[in-house]
């Protein structure tokens, strides 16, 4: 499993935790939830690039 996939999973878990806290009225958890979403977005972009590179490498290998 790539590092970006691990990061996505970790940040998703963090987001779920913080979002639940925010829903219960903890406003500070909202900032942490947004940060987790931002980190997840970065990791998702990195994974998209990894997938594209692997796809192109497979194309060239044929």
Show the residue positions of the predicted features.
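Long amphipathic alpha-helical coiled-coil segments
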Residues: 36, 58-62
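Short amphipathic alpha-helical/adjacent loop interface patches that line ligand
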Residues: 12, 37, 44
């Amino acid at each position: 499993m790539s590092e970006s996939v691990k990061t996505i999973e970790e940040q998703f878990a963090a987001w779920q935790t913080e979002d639940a806290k925010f829903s219960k009225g903890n406003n500070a958890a909202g900032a942490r939830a947004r940060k987790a979403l931002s980190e997840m977005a970065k990791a998702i972009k990195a994974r998209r690039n990894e997938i594209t590179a692997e796809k192109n490498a497979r194309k060239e290998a044929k």
